[in-house]
């Protein structure tokens, strides 16, 4: 759903550019093109690229993105994922108040399309109204030594939901973040 959401977001912003006023957006439809093509979480070698960042990975996709993240020093990162084990929308705030303050409106906006995952434990982490404060090591993120640290959010949709609803939820979530 992430690539579809990226395309819909860009189409939406082309029609209403004022919604991104003051932002320089870099949109990556996927970080795992071979996994996307195969319909798998892992890449062509079966490796979950979203556990490889900032851990000395030899995977070319990870190396290239790490180089770009260092060069560009983004002020914010929004990762869009579909989770095949969740019961609804949720997100990762990485233990930072700024991230949580951006994630909650994104979840509310996304909730117009899909239900919230309100379980107290999601993906093995404690959750509060769909917000998880900690995350797996190796996920796509800014360089660990980047200062000031950018906001960094992961927005998850239920993979079992129709792709169009996931994409709509993701787009509205990103637009909510941009409006904050």
Q: Model regions: which residues?
A:
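Structured catalytic-domain cores with a bias toward divalent-metal coordination
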Residues: 1-180
